From Swiss-Prot:
The gene is OPG159. InterPro entries: Poxvirus_A31. This is Protein OPG159. Pfam families: Pox_A31. Belongs to the orthopoxvirus OPG159 protein family. It comes from Vaccinia virus (strain Western Reserve).
Length: 124
């Protein structure tokens, strides 16, 4: 348990670049600071489903598994120097920059298409 957390703390201070093999090859379930984590490598189809549902279409990130915070289940990933979570419905949360201080304080809105794209002709 402590080794995966220590690995993540080390990567936070150095780099997550090319670290997929150093994180975990098997499922590791832990509870840490009131949160439930399952560290593992999800199937590619699962990753695509969650990320595309949240409007994330690049691969400059590291998927770490799942996290449950305040009964909200999310896929956990590291991107842009922070941990993020994305729900099955596509809601994205920026959780924080340290595995020891994650919270649901910040929601990221990626879908802004809430308006009607109709065109009106002039009456000229």
């Amino acid at each position: 348990m402590a080794s995966i957390l220590n690995t993540l703390r080390f990567l936070e201070k150095t780099s997550f670049y090319n670290c997929n093999d150093s994180i975990t090859k098997e499922k590791i379930k832990i509870k840490h600071k009131g949160m439930s984590f399952v560290f593992y490598k999800p199937k590619h189809s699962t990753v695509v489903k969650y990320l595309s549902g949240g409007g994330i279409y690049h691969d400059d990130l590291v998927v770490l598994g799942k996290v449950t915070i305040n009964n909200l289940k999310m896929m956990l990933f590291y991107m842009d120097l922070s941990y993020h979570g994305v729900t099955s419905s596509g809601a994205i949360y920026k959780l924080g920059s340290s595995i020891d201080r994650l919270s649901l304080n910040r929601t990221i809105v990626t879908k802004v298409n809430n308006y009607d794209d109709t065109f009106f002709d002039d009456d000229d």
